[in-house]
Regions:
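An acidic-aromatic
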Residues: 65-126, 192-195
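N-terminal leader/targeting segments and the immediate start of mature chains
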Residues: 2-72, 204-220
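Non-transmembrane domains of secretory- and envelope-associated proteins
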Residues: 5-11, 140, 151, 168-169, ...
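Flexible, processing/modification-adjacent segments and terminal tails
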Residues: 28-35, 43, 95-165
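A short, surface-exposed beta-strand/turn
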Residues: 67-69, 90-95, 169-186
Length: 220
């Protein structure tokens, strides 16, 4: 009798655990699917500006400004180490890509030497190929509500999609509830914040600097 009662209790406990896991996974899947749908219109935009600030260490900061308007692209990378800045700007006119490098000692222009601009990887870290993948990656995920720079966000931890950048010990994406845009990324000790503009990029942004101020490095 005691054995049967014990087995019944164990069965009830297992059932409760299974139900809790199902509820957890269904909730996460619904939230993530909703964010995927909301961000889609922004991911398809060809008129935008993304600013990403990454604190790599106490003395090192990386600032990325990425602009696109139709076929025109501009990517500005600034790396600041102990208050010394290196700035690299890539201008894509649609026919070629020109690179301008600035340090405290020199300015160098390289015209047509780069084949591709690689900027901010994605507007969303929640990319999956299908619903089954979303469900699978939702299982270990932890989601809570947070505020990032006055934006209401979901803090999504351990969504371990192969399309994401992943930390060794911590992977956290804070994603705006209203738009699905990622506002903050935490990969271990590295913290990145992002800001966005859409449908408001002026052509003047893509005007290259005065090349006479630079040393021209010939294409090899």
């Amino acid at each position: 009798m005691k054995i049967k009662k014990g087995l019944k209790i164990i069965g009830i406990i297992i059932l409760i655990i299974v139900v809790l896991i199902l509820v957890h996974t269904i909730r996460n899947t619904i939230i993530i699917s909703d964010l995927q749908n909301k961000v889609e219109k922004y991911s398809n935009s060809n008129n935008y500006h993304i600013k990403a600030i990454t604190h790599i260490s106490e003395n090192t900061t990386m600032i990325i400004n990425q602009y696109q308007k139709n076929e025109k692209q501009l990517l500005i990378l600034e790396r600041i180490v102990n208050d010394e800045k290196v700035k690299i700007s890539y201008y894509n006119t649609g026919s070629r890509i020109d690179m301008f490098t600035e340090t405290k000692d020199e300015k160098i222009a390289e015209l047509g030497k780069v084949n591709e601009i690689l900027g901010v990887s994605s507007m969303t870290p929640l990319q999956t190929d299908n619903l089954w993948q979303t469900i699978l990656y939702s299982l270990p995920t932890r989601i809570k509500t947070v505020k990032v720079n006055d934006y209401e966000c979901y803090s999504i931890n351990d969504f371990l999609s192969p399309y994401n950048l992943l930390g060794k010990n911590k992977t956290e994406y804070d994603i705006e509830k209203e738009t699905g845009l990622v506002r903050k990324i935490v990969l271990d000790e590295q913290i990145t914040t992002r800001e966005y503009e859409f449908e408001n990029i002026d052509d003047s942004v893509f005007v290259e600097p005065d090349i006479s101020q630079y040393t021209l490095k010939e294409k090899e």
